């Protein structure tokens, strides 16, 4: 601890003096959200951490840290210093390859990282570096206080730091690979002295300010020198101040967490948190300026009073420093005008922060050498030509710093920038270029580089061009340089050519050849970077390009030697004139040629007439100049400024000018007013029936899309690129010219839904993840269950482009990225293939990349396929675009395609490029015939599509007006439409000035017609102004916009367009056109039609014509109070609960009149997954109530069973009642037909009115006398009708049981009897068992055991004529007796006298007793007659005759039906057998719930009934049974077939309901290991168990665990991933290769054979495990 008598020697001493001083100890030192630390608390916590760290790594450790700024990390830094150690913070966004290099350089004692950082945990393990993982949620200020404030104060044996020891290891930000990593060691002494110097400078800047206790707004990462040498040292610790987090760490739990962007958070803190110091980068100050001025580019807008408050707060800041890069002049001017005290700091890590600092005016005036921060430093400028020079005063050169305090060099990296003399003076060459003003101030000019910086923002590396030029045999040496040389940004690129001696001898002939060398180079360069011939200097033989002694171009001397030659103009400057009265083609051509020759500096006629303008080096500026000069010289000509892009060479431009000047009418390429459509091969119309999308701004549904378009919400959709993507600040604005984009969530993904393990999902590119999601969701939007497509010829077309994911993978994992998932996870071809594979569809599966027209190409290819295929009627179209790596953004910046302001200001005077956006869109296309068949909702009809190419234009990426106009014409012709038939056009509309002009010209060329537009002006919309440019998905976003306009009846206005800023160069009068800035209503006539246009930088053009759907005809509304089945399903129980919650919200807002359609769609329009909910509701209110009840229940949903576990139970006689089939027959035509046909047949054969009894509508006739003969037939007909009806719905039993008479129906279901034979048997049996009037008989049911009933019979003194016998044993306390009517009366009376419940049945025969012996001969005769028609059982029959199971494949005994009528019914025994051997649900098929009740009484709990008790709704009971079967037992009826049977089926329609709630989890390389590793878990123990055939040593449970471990191992599940044993291997993503590995593993390790059938979806993993355990047990028994 520092004594108060001695000055502090380290910042740690300063901190301890404050923390242990009674006057300052309780001051706040740190504020994070609502949490605060005092100096004393931080001292205590850091001491405790030091003690813990000491036990881990000892004294004087080097502790590396990879984490965002976090309170725990600051405490840790102090702890490391208290141990005498070195703190090495590493940028959290550094790629893994660089992190590995950094760790090798610093050789840390340990690496401290958040517990969630699996990637760096793996990396550290690979490098054998101990890891200390902290849990961010357990490391908050309150949690650390709770844990450590009770600890004792710092122990006296902590050594503290040697002032001359490195306190920090900081890496520079310039590294591009491990080879140039530079680590700067900064000692405690150096840090303290520089901090003191910086504080002294602050006081000089603000002498009136008391800095004591200042509140400092902290933002800079602690891996950056700015954080330590500005925020922490000079301002916080040296002033006993408080460090305030500008943004709360992402992992820090706090109630005050602010999700706003950095600029908004900083502004909020400056206004309301009392901060007085803030150090930041230029873009932050630019953002604050934009907030103050409410610029349209800012993410969040302030109210007028808030803007005033922010400006006032900025004016009262004490320190507001900008570092890291030079401040924009506009921001500097704004600060000066508004008296905002901005200061500028220029420095680098090697110098411990700023070298110079000064007020904002220093940008222009320079920095005083007095404002240096290294006390003993000397600054001087040196020559930068790498040659020796004597010491002399120079006014410009590289800055060199000389000081004894500077670091002695980089750690572990030898660099000539540092040198140390014998006296200990360190000389450091900064690599920065400065000039010295006459008054001795230093002005920063930039870095010493060879790159050419253009005024247009592009940066050009001249060396590749120089190399290409030197490949010519004519050129000896070439130098490419900007026209400003080294004096600033260049407006043009120049070339100096030194010829080979042999070329010089050819004289003038070389000029033409050299021009041809430039042609292909210029053709491939963006227009601003092309080298015009007027900027090419070909040297004379005596002239040479200056070179250094090292053989490199001496670029500094270029201006001195050739400046005047390159700066002069070439050619004749006199202007040509033309006589407006007489136009001669030859004179006009010469005039045009003369102007082009002079502007381009090309005098060779052959070159002018044979090369394109691009090949001649024409830039955008030169093209504009030529158009303006031609307009000025040639009276009567009014060429657009992009004329040279429309007419791409001299001959075509001359012809166009001649035609305009001579008032010639060019060939009319506009189609006739109406043409017959071009016939497609199949004559099929294609319609859109489904859509889904993921767009920036969380635009994921039609409501949010509509709101975004109508409100023109671009400012909330296009946002700053966050740090969790990449460190964008390190690229902006030098390499990437924009800092905003439209981004979607690419980190979170529901991998298990798509059958992927977490490991495989990590390798799946976000582009493909989104494609999968939207494709599946589009099918749901179209109400197409995915299983409906299985095995079909459905096609899949996906448009993608390079998303940088492969680069990210390789950067993250290096060679280790090449796992078995590498290819399939990132190859573009698998984007479509994966969708086809998951859906099991067999049509074309094609991935397209034509850049920004990809989506349109997919639509076109799909339509060709659907119209030409006789086997297909559906196609899935998708386009997906993400940006995982900043490389494409740099490409766009270099091409000049993007807007520095981050917007698409299409068709405005502000148009300066587009803003890239991410997004994915999917559409479902069907033939109209199929859509009408399936009752689909049609969103639009696709009238025509067309794909073409620009051909040769001003370069590959340049637009071609003629080609675009031809595309429009072709579309109209294919659609058979005139221009007037198109109401609006969704433009490509990227917002580039040249592209906008070309697009409008093409529309004018194609749509200008001699016939006036009676429908009003042609409206031009541009969705990119709101959404941004989603590139390959752009055409599909355009389609979304059109569909939205069709639905809303209005075209949205363009964002960024106002009433005053429409580009005046756009011709809106010819067609005419309307480019709206507000929504425009679409008036009649209908149908509305629109064209969608797209253009890829590949040159591929795409166009689509869409027609709005017919208006829905108003039909009589369905009653909204009828019973309807409502179902919901999900793949996990958490998803199901979320789904139900979302449905509750949805239904509360829904129209009650839509109740039936919602329920119908839930059944027929969704896939049915394993976790289910189903209910029967009568109206919307009822449905909402049932959902609320379910959500209020705490019982988690369970997965449904397999479909095979289903048995039918058939009731016997006594369950019948008049009209028992009436209600279901009325409700369902399918059942009505089945029961009517069978009843009619039975009536004809039996002579009884079976149909009238079953379908009687006078069901009030209760007192109908029993007729056992007719009753038996009725029961049979009813139950067999229900059986057949269920079978038509796909509900089939896997086992059956029949009570008495019901066993005949059961035998039909089991396949033992045909329906005809069974009907004949029932009729014959009923006739044979007919009751006798002379011997009246009956049956009675008694609530007593069989023994008790036998005892009762014995108590009666009965003669043979009035005998009784037990005829049915239904259960332990349910026995039925048969006998004479008198005997029945007697035993019932006796039982009641003994308090035994007993009642006579409504039957007039004593079945299953000696009373039916007279029927035996006749039944035996029937059996003998039909013995040849007997068939083996197809499913098990639990016989109530035998009380046992008759297995599948067995035949019934020939006397089975004889014994069946005569012998007692052993239902209880049969039920017991069923309980022991059958697992699943049993459905009571009977007309009343008798079998259901009997089964329950015998202990079978999984029972449901299709019928209700008499007097209750049979339809509700039936639907309730279906709900039960669906929810709990995995039964999926044919809902489409069921609903088609309803009387009002034609009025049921599919409607929009909720789509699946994906359970997304984070799947990013930054948060998970990129190379799968196995932790020491059960997985590893499972592996040990399988090191040989050890099966015999394992118990069943161990064997089961070992098999499960093997499955998890092969699936590469992470340790925290559960294995759902109820799922199939296939559903979890196991392919045939993986299955072969599993079979080998279990076969070699356990000696067990895994049957191939377990790879199918028919079996679960649990069933496979059980099979293998049984296999092992059987093997042991043998």
UniProtKB/Swiss-Prot annotation:
<keyword id="KW-0596">Phosphopantetheine</keyword>
<dbReference type="Pfam" id="PF02801">
    <property type="entry name" value="Ketoacyl-synt_C"/>
</dbReference>
<dbReference type="InterPro" id="IPR006162">
    <property type="entry name" value="Ppantetheine_attach_site"/>
</dbReference>
<dbReference type="InterPro" id="IPR001227">
    <property type="entry name" value="Ac_transferase_dom_sf"/>
</dbReference>
<feature type="domain" description="Carrier 2">
    <location>
        <begin position="1597"/>
        <end position="1672"/>
    </location>
</feature>
<dbReference type="InterPro" id="IPR016039">
    <property type="entry name" value="Thiolase-like"/>
</dbReference>
<feature type="active site" description="For beta-ketoacyl synthase activity">
    <location>
        <position position="988"/>
    </location>
</feature>
<dbReference type="Pfam" id="PF23562">
    <property type="entry name" value="AMP-binding_C_3"/>
</dbReference>
<dbReference type="InterPro" id="IPR020806">
    <property type="entry name" value="PKS_PP-bd"/>
</dbReference>
<dbReference type="Pfam" id="PF22621">
    <property type="entry name" value="CurL-like_PKS_C"/>
</dbReference>
<dbReference type="InterPro" id="IPR000873">
    <property type="entry name" value="AMP-dep_synth/lig_dom"/>
</dbReference>
<feature type="region of interest" description="Adenylation (A) domain">
    <location>
        <begin position="33"/>
        <end position="453"/>
    </location>
</feature>
<feature type="region of interest" description="Disordered">
    <location>
        <begin position="1562"/>
        <end position="1582"/>
    </location>
</feature>
<dbReference type="InterPro" id="IPR020841">
    <property type="entry name" value="PKS_Beta-ketoAc_synthase_dom"/>
</dbReference>
<dbReference type="GO" id="GO:0006633">
    <property type="term" value="P:fatty acid biosynthetic process"/>
</dbReference>
<feature type="compositionally biased region" description="Polar residues">
    <location>
        <begin position="1564"/>
        <end position="1576"/>
    </location>
</feature>
<dbReference type="InterPro" id="IPR036736">
    <property type="entry name" value="ACP-like_sf"/>
</dbReference>
<dbReference type="InterPro" id="IPR009081">
    <property type="entry name" value="PP-bd_ACP"/>
</dbReference>
<dbReference type="InterPro" id="IPR016036">
    <property type="entry name" value="Malonyl_transacylase_ACP-bd"/>
</dbReference>
<dbReference type="Pfam" id="PF00698">
    <property type="entry name" value="Acyl_transf_1"/>
</dbReference>
<feature type="active site" description="For beta-ketoacyl synthase activity">
    <location>
        <position position="1029"/>
    </location>
</feature>
<feature type="domain" description="Ketosynthase family 3 (KS3)">
    <location>
        <begin position="683"/>
        <end position="1108"/>
    </location>
</feature>
<dbReference type="InterPro" id="IPR016035">
    <property type="entry name" value="Acyl_Trfase/lysoPLipase"/>
</dbReference>
<dbReference type="Pfam" id="PF00550">
    <property type="entry name" value="PP-binding"/>
</dbReference>
<feature type="active site" description="For beta-ketoacyl synthase activity">
    <location>
        <position position="852"/>
    </location>
</feature>
<comment type="function">
    <text>PKS-NRPS hybrid synthetase; part of the gene cluster that mediates the fungal bioluminescence cycle. Performs the biosynthesis of hispidin from caffeic acid by two cycles of addition of malonyl units followed by lactonization. The fungal bioluminescence cycle begins with the hispidin synthetase that catalyzes the formation of hispidin which is further hydroxylated by the hispidin-3-hydroxylase, yielding the fungal luciferin 3-hydroxyhispidin.</text>
</comment>
<protein>
    <recommendedName>
        <fullName>Hispidin synthase</fullName>
        <ecNumber>2.3.1.-</ecNumber>
    </recommendedName>
</protein>
<comment type="pathway">
    <text>Secondary metabolite biosynthesis.</text>
</comment>
<feature type="region of interest" description="Malonyl-CoA:ACP transacylase (MAT) domain">
    <location>
        <begin position="1201"/>
        <end position="1499"/>
    </location>
</feature>
<feature type="modified residue" description="O-(pantetheine 4'-phosphoryl)serine">
    <location>
        <position position="620"/>
    </location>
</feature>
<feature type="modified residue" description="O-(pantetheine 4'-phosphoryl)serine">
    <location>
        <position position="1632"/>
    </location>
</feature>
<dbReference type="Pfam" id="PF00109">
    <property type="entry name" value="ketoacyl-synt"/>
</dbReference>
<dbReference type="GO" id="GO:0031177">
    <property type="term" value="F:phosphopantetheine binding"/>
</dbReference>
<dbReference type="GO" id="GO:0004312">
    <property type="term" value="F:fatty acid synthase activity"/>
</dbReference>
<comment type="similarity">
    <text>In the N-terminal section; belongs to the NRP synthetase family.</text>
</comment>
<dbReference type="InterPro" id="IPR014030">
    <property type="entry name" value="Ketoacyl_synth_N"/>
</dbReference>
<keyword id="KW-0808">Transferase</keyword>
<dbReference type="InterPro" id="IPR050091">
    <property type="entry name" value="PKS_NRPS_Biosynth_Enz"/>
</dbReference>
<dbReference type="InterPro" id="IPR042099">
    <property type="entry name" value="ANL_N_sf"/>
</dbReference>
<dbReference type="InterPro" id="IPR014031">
    <property type="entry name" value="Ketoacyl_synth_C"/>
</dbReference>
<keyword id="KW-0597">Phosphoprotein</keyword>
<dbReference type="Pfam" id="PF00501">
    <property type="entry name" value="AMP-binding"/>
</dbReference>
């Amino acid at each position: 601890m520092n004594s108060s008598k001695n000055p502090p020697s380290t910042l740690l001493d300063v901190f301890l003096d404050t923390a242990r001083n009674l006057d300052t100890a309780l001051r706040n030192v740190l504020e994070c959200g609502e949490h605060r630390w005092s100096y004393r608390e931080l001292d205590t916590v850091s001491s405790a951490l030091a003690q813990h760290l000491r036990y881990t790594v000892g004294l004087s450790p080097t502790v590396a840290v990879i984490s965002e700024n976090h309170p725990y990390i600051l405490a840790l830094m102090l702890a490391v210093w208290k141990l005498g150690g070195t703190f090495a913070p590493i940028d959290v966004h550094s790629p893994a390859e660089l992190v590995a290099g950094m760790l090798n350089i610093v050789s840390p004692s340990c690496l401290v990282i958040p517990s969630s950082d699996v990637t760096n945990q793996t990396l550290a393990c690979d490098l054998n570096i101990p890891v200390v993982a902290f849990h961010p949620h357990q490391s908050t200020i309150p949690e650390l206080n709770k844990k450590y404030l009770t600890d004792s104060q710092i122990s006296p044996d902590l050594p503290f730091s040697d002032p001359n020891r490195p306190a920090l290891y900081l890496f520079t930000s310039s590294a591009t690979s491990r080879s140039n990593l530079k680590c700067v060691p900064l000692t405690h002494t150096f840090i303290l002295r520089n901090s003191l110097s910086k504080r002294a400078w602050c006081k000089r800047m603000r002498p009136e300010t008391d800095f004591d206790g200042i509140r400092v707004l902290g933002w800079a990462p602690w891996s950056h020198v700015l954080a330590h040498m500005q925020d922490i040292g000079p301002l916080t610790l040296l002033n006993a101040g408080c460090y305030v987090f500008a943004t709360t760490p992402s992992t820090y739990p706090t109630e005050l967490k602010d999700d706003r962007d950095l600029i908004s958070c900083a502004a909020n803190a400056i206004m309301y948190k009392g901060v007085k110091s803030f150090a930041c980068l230029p873009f932050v100050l630019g953002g604050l300026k934009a907030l103050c001025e409410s610029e349209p580019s800012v993410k969040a807008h302030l109210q007028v009073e808030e803007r005033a408050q922010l400006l006032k707060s900025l004016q009262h800041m004490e320190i507001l420093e900008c570092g890291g890069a030079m401040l924009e002049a506009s921001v500097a001017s704004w600060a000066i005008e508004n008296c905002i005290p901005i200061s500028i700091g220029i420095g680098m890590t090697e110098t411990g922060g700023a070298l110079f600092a000064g007020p904002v005016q220093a940008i222009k005036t320079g920095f005083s050498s007095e404002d240096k921060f290294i006390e003993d430093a000397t600054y001087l400028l040196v020559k930068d030509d790498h040659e020796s020079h004597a010491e002399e005063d120079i006014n410009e050169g590289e800055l060199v710093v000389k000081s004894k305090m500077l670091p002695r060099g980089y750690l572990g990296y030898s660099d000539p920038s540092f040198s140390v003399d014998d006296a200990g003076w360190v000389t450091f060459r900064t690599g920065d270029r400065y000039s010295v003003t006459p008054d001795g101030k230093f002005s920063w000019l930039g870095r010493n580089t060879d790159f050419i910086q253009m005024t247009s923002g592009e940066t050009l590396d001249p060396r590749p061009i120089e190399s290409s030029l030197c490949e010519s045999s004519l050129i000896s040496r070439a130098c490419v340089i900007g026209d400003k040389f080294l004096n600033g940004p260049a407006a043009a690129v120049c070339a100096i050519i030194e010829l080979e001696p042999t070329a010089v001898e050819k004289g003038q002939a070389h000029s033409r050849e050299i021009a041809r060398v430039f042609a292909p180079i210029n053709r491939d360069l963006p227009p601003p970077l092309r080298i015009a011939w007027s900027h090419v200097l070909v040297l004379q033989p005596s002239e040479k390009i200056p070179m250094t002694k090292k053989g490199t171009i001496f670029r500094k001397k270029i201006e001195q030697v050739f400046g005047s030659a390159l700066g002069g103009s070439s050619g004749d400057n006199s202007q040509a004139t033309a006589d407006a009265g007489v136009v001669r083609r030859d004179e006009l051509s010469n005039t045009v040629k003369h102007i082009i020759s002079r502007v381009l500096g090309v005098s060779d006629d052959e070159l002018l007439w044979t090369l394109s303008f691009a090949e001649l080096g024409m830039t955008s500026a030169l093209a504009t100049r030529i158009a303006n000069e031609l307009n000025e010289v040639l009276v009567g000509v009014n060429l657009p400024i992009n004329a040279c892009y429309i007419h791409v060479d001299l001959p075509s431009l001359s012809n166009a000018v001649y035609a305009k000047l001579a008032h010639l009418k060019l060939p009319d390429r506009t189609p006739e007013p109406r043409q017959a459509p071009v016939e497609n091969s199949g004559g099929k119309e294609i319609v859109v029936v489904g859509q889904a999308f993921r767009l920036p701004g969380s635009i994921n549904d039609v409501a949010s899309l509509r709101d975004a378009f109508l409100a023109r919400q671009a400012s909330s959709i296009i946002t700053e690129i966050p740090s969790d993507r990449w460190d964008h600040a390190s690229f902006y604005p030098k390499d990437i010219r924009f800092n905003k984009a439209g981004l979607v969530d690419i980190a979170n993904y529901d991998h298990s839904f798509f059958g992927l393990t977490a490991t495989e999902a990590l390798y799946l590119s976000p582009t493909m993840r989104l494609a999968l999601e939207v494709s599946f969701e589009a099918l749901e939007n179209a109400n197409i269950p995915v299983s409906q497509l299985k095995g079909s010829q459905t096609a899949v077309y996906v448009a993608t482009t390079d998303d940088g994911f492969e680069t990210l993978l390789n950067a993250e994992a290096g060679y280790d990225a090449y796992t078995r998932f590498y290819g399939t996870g990132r190859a573009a071809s698998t984007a479509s293939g994966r969708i086809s594979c998951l859906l099991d569809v067999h049509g074309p599966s094609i991935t397209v990349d034509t850049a920004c027209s990809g989506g349109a190409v997919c639509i076109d290819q799909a339509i060709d396929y659907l119209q030409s295929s006789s086997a297909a009627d559906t196609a899935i179209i998708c386009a997906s675009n993400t940006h995982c790596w900043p490389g494409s953004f740099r490409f766009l910046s270099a091409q000049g395609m993007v807007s520095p302001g981050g917007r698409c200001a299409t068709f405005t005077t502000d148009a300066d490029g587009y803003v890239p956006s991410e997004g994915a869109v999917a559409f479902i296309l069907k033939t109209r015939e199929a859509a009408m068949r399936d009752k689909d909702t049609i969103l639009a009809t696709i009238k025509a599509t067309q794909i073409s190419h620009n051909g040769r234009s001003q370069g590959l990426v340049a637009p071609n007006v003629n080609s675009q106009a031809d595309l429009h014409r072709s579309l109209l012709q294919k659609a058979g439409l005139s221009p007037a038939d198109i109401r609006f056009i969704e433009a490509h509309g990227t917002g580039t000035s040249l592209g906008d002009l070309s697009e409008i010209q093409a529309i004018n060329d194609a749509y200008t017609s001699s016939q006036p537009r009676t429908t009003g002006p042609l409206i031009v919309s541009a969705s990119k102004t709101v959404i941004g440019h989603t590139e390959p998905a752009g055409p599909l976003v355009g389609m979304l916009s059109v569909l939205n306009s069709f639905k809303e009846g209005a075209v949205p206005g363009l964002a960024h367009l106002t009433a005053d800023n429409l580009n005046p160069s756009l011709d809106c009068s010819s067609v005419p056109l309307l480019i709206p800035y507000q929504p425009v209503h679409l008036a009649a006539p209908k149908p509305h039609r629109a064209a969608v246009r797209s253009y890829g930088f590949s040159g591929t053009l795409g166009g689509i014509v869409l027609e709005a759907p017919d208006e829905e005809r108003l039909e009589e509304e369905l009653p909204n109070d009828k019973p309807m089945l409502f179902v919901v399903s999900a793949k996990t129980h958490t998803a199901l609960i979320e789904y139900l919650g979302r449905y509750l919200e949805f239904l509360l807002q829904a129209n009650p009149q839509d109740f039936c359609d919602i329920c119908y769609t839930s059944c027929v329009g969704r896939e049915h997954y394993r976790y289910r909910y189903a209910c029967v509701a009568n109206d919307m209110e009822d449905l909402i109530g049932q959902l609320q009840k379910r959500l209020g229940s705490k019982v988690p949903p369970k997965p449904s069973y397999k479909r095979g576990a289903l048995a039918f139970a058939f009731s016997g006689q006594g369950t019948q009642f008049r009209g028992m089939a009436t209600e279901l027959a009325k409700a369902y035509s399918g059942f009505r037909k089945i029961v009517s046909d069978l009843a009619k047949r039975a009536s004809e054969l039996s002579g009884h009115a079976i149909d009238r009894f079953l379908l009687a509508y006078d069901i009030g006739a209760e007192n109908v006398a029993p007729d056992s003969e007719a009753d038996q037939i009725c029961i049979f007909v009813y139950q067999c009708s229900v059986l057949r009806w269920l079978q038509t719905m796909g509900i089939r039993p896997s086992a059956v049981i029949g009570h008495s008479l019901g066993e005949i129906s059961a035998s039909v279901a089991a396949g033992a009897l045909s329906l005809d034979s069974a009907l004949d048997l029932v009729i014959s049996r009923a006739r044979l068992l007919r009751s006798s009037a002379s011997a009246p008989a009956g049956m009675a049911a008694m609530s007593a055991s069989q023994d008790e009933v036998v005892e009762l019979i014995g108590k009666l003194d009965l003669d043979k004529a009035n005998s009784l016998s037990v005829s049915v044993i239904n259960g332990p306390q349910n026995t039925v007796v048969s006998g004479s009517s008198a005997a029945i009366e007697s035993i019932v009376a006796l039982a009641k006298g003994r308090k035994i419940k007993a009642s006579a049945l409504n039957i007039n025969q004593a079945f299953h007793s000696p009373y039916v012996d007279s029927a035996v001969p006749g039944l035996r005769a029937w059996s003998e007659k039909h013995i040849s028609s007997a068939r083996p059982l197809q499913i098990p029959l639990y016989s109530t005759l035998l009380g046992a199971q008759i297995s599948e494949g067995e035949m019934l005994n020939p006397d089975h039906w004889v014994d069946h009528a005569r012998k007692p019914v052993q239902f209880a025994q049969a039920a017991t057998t069923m309980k022991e051997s059958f697992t699943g649900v049993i459905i009571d098929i009977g007309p009343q719930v008798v079998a259901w009740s009997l089964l329950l009484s015998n202990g079978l709990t999984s029972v449901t009934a299709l019928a209700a008790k008499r007097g209750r709704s049979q339809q509700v009971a039936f639907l309730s049974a279906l709900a039960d079967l669906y929810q709990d037992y995995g039964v999926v009826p044919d809902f489409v077939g069921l609903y088609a049977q309803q009387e009002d089926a034609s009025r049921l329609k599919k409607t929009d309901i909720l789509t699946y709630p994906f359970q997304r989890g984070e799947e990013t390389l930054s948060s998970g290991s990129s190379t799968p590793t196995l932790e020491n878990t059960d997985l590893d123990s499972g592996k040990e168990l399988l090191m040989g055939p050890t099966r015999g040593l394992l118990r069943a449970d161990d064997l089961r665990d070992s098999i499960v471990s093997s499955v998890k191992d092969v699936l590469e599940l992470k340790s925290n991933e559960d294995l759902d044993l109820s799922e199939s291997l296939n559903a979890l993503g196991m392919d045939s290769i993986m299955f072969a590995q599993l079979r080998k593993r279990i076969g070699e390790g356990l000696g067990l054979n895994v049957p191939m059938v377990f790879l199918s979806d028919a079996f679960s993993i649990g069933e496979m495990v059980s099979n293998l355990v049984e296999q092992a047990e059987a093997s042991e028994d043998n």
